[in-house]
Amino acid sequence: SEHIDEVLEQIRKDIEVRGPLSSQDFDFDKKVGWYWAPAKASRAALESMYWWGELVVHHRAGTRKYYDLAGRHIPQDIFDRLDPNTTEEAYHRWHISRRIDSIGLFWSRSGDAWLGIKGLNSAKRTAAIEEMVRSGELIELEIEGFDYPVYTSSVNRELLDRSHESTGAPEASFIAPLDNLLWDRKFIKSLFQFEYTWEVYKRPQDRKYGYYVLPVLFGREFVARFEPVFDKKKRVLNIKNWWWEEGVVVTEDMKEAIRKCTDDFAGFLGAEKIAT
């Protein structure tokens, strides 16, 4: 953006002289188109400089990020190292491996989890994954009742072998809306028959469930979703709403696992009481 380019040099100079700064420390009037909504040129410039490696996040004050020059915190020899990926193909294999490792296992179909990998399209992704399977870097798996192959890192082979063994009663987990597992909603819907939308950015009247709703995983199934509200002053975790998924048979093991998970969640938040 032209407006971002106009402020880059001033931002560099100010951070060099004054140390870590946030977007609020710059008096630029202009706004730029930026992802979900227009943003101040200072914020867009700081985020851009962070993404290309010129700045680091030094600290936060609440939700506000303070940026500093990367060279003050990262040794120069790291900056001087050559890119290990000398070809586009090598870069794509490296980035595909990172994405699959981040999720655990994943398919090769187009979707949100593949966004942001420079130059990668469907044909290149397919070719890269096939080569990674041939070389032994990835393992191709078939899931009973699932129409598409999925892939995981070869380092997970032992874990896959152990997954056939009985491990006792299933456990419950609350999944954060931006958890890697939920990156690709189409994948989750196809694999688990679980449809999830993060409704934070929807108007209240347009929401099906709630503002901040967490999926509940029990064993290998998504069995519910709920809306937690944490009262920081009273240190109370309020379970505002709870929705069981259609067809779920609620058992004592399931309820006990969810109770334990809720206690753990409350402890993580610092809640002293749970209210339903």
Spans of features found by a protein language model:
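Long, low-complexity intrinsically disordered regions
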Residues: S1-S173, D179-N180, F187, F194-W198, ...
